[in-house]
Structures are given as structure tokens and as C-alpha cells.
């Protein structure tokens, strides 16, 4: 039996980040539903991002399910390697 559930996706971002725009676009092209948390508008959320990402301060910070993907470069690399669809539950 195939698992058809899709993992929860969270992207921590800011309103001025071009890499956030690229990550958002890639996830949207994949048809992924995700939550976007703007850390420039909420310091408590920024602190949560820092804790969850192991102290990484750059944005975006992307999580697919329990997996910390990292930023846009890592997300793009997963897509090019054919792994992103699998992580999104689409493979």
C-alpha cells in the first residue's frame, strides 16, 4: 500500500530575501503546500528557527517533515538529484 500523505513543510523567511523567493517559487512549482514564517516580523519565531535549525541564521531555512533541508541551495540540489519529489511524497 502506498502512503499518499504529504509531509508538513515549513519555510522560515524574510520579506527581503531573494533566496526565499526562489525557494517559494520552487515549492509552488512542485505543487507543495507549505507554511511560511516571516522571522523579520517576529523575534520569537526567529529564535524558534535558530533552535530548530541548530543555530543557522540565514534564510530561508526549510523543513520537510522532521528533516532540516537547509536553504535554497540545498533545496535546489535535492530537486536536481531527483530527491525532492520523494521527500514531498510525490515519488
Model-inferred region functions:
Residues 2-13, 51, 81-82, 88-91:
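C-terminal alpha-helical interaction module
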Residues 2-33:
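Local sequence-structure signature of Cys/Sec-based thiol-disulfide redox active-site neighborhoods
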Residues 22-24, 30-31, 51, 77, ...:
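Non-catalytic interaction surface on structured domains
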Residues 38-57, 83-91:
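Thioredoxin-like thiol-disulfide oxidoreductase module
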Residues 54-63, 73:
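Structural micro-motif
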Residues 64-90:
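Non-catalytic, surface beta->alpha helical segment in thiol-disulfide oxidoreductase systems
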Amino acid at each position: 500500500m502506498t502512503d499518499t500523505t504529504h509531509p508538513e513543510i515549513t519555510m522560515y523567511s524574510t520579506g527581503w530575501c531573494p533566496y526565499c523567493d526562489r525557494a517559494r517559487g520552487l515549492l509552488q512549482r512542485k505543487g507543495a503546500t507549505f507554511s511560511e514564517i516571516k522571522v523579520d516580523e517576529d523575534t520569537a519565531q526567529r529564535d524558534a528557527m535558530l533552535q530548530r535549525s541548530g543555530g543557522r541564521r540565514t534564510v530561508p531555512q526549510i523543513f520537510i517533515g522532521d528533516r532540516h533541508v537547509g536553504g535554497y541551495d540545498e533545496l535546489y540540489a535535492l530537486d536536481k538529484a531527483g530527491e525532492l519529489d520523494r521527500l514531498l511524497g510525490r515519488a
